[in-house]
Amino acid sequence: MGRDFYGEIRDEVIKKGEPLVPEFIKNNSDIKTTTLPNGNSVMEPVAITEWVNKVRRKVIHNKEYVEAEIETQKSAARNEVETIKQYWRDNVFTDRKEVDEHIVTASVFALGAWFFGSVVSSKRNWGFQSPWNSDKSGILKRTPSQFSKLLTNLPVRLTLPWILAGTVYSQLTPNTWNNALSAIKRDVLPKDVVEQSSALYDDIIEKGLKIQLRSLNQSAHENLQASICSIRETIAENVK
């Protein structure tokens, strides 16, 4: 006959109704047995309990670390946003009248100008992708002009919407616009780029285009005066 699973059972255990504990658990140091007040017997594997507690502490530690890191990043982000807002208030939005009365209107018009520039410089609006743009269309054929090709090239498509939007801002909120340009030149763009772009602007616009326009304006004014003088002389001779 095989060995009894519960070993030797005392009569007083049976009489008291105490739980029966398997024999291999009684003297096993890896398993802790506890009897609850209601008589139930609880067996606790010590090694497993220690491992679970270790994992639990590690999970709690990682959770607290992640939460602390998230709060740190949130605080840093809030500080960064507040720093940016303060920078814009101190360096760009310094004209309170423009900010309070014109900035919203200027933004709406600038957005409209940006979309207008996008539409004007789109190839689809100049016949490049028209179904009639083929040799089989006959008299209905749409051939893009040189002006449309100039207006729809890649540099123009990339810059025209922004140029129009910037023009709106420069006309409706000139102080804010100039402050924004100064801040970009001072704190965003490299110094070499700013110097080169300023020199290029002076050569092309100030010393080139504006001088030619002034010369053309002066020539037109002189020619207009000469023409008026000639007309007056002609009228005076005819009257005599």
From Swiss-Prot:
Domain of life: Eukaryota
Its membrane topology: Multi-pass membrane protein
Compartments where located: Mitochondrion inner membrane
Primary location class: mitochondrion
Keyword terms of this UniProt record: Membrane, Mitochondrion, Mitochondrion inner membrane, Transmembrane, Transmembrane helix
The UniProt record lists the keyword Zinc: no
Mitochondrial matrix side: 121-149
Transmembrane segments: 101-120, 150-169
Regions of this protein lying in the Mitochondrial intermembrane compartment: 1-100, 170-240
One annotated Gene Ontology cellular component of this protein: mitochondrial inner membrane
Family of this protein: Belongs to the apolipoprotein O/MICOS complex subunit Mic27 family.
Reported function: Component of the MICOS complex, a large protein complex of the mitochondrial inner membrane that plays crucial roles in the maintenance of crista junctions, inner membrane architecture, and formation of contact sites to the outer membrane.
Subunit structure: Component of the mitochondrial contact site and cristae organizing system (MICOS) complex.
Protein name: MICOS complex subunit MIC27
Provenance organism: Kluyveromyces lactis (strain ATCC 8585 / CBS 2359 / DSM 70799 / NBRC 1267 / NRRL Y-1140 / WM37) (Yeast)
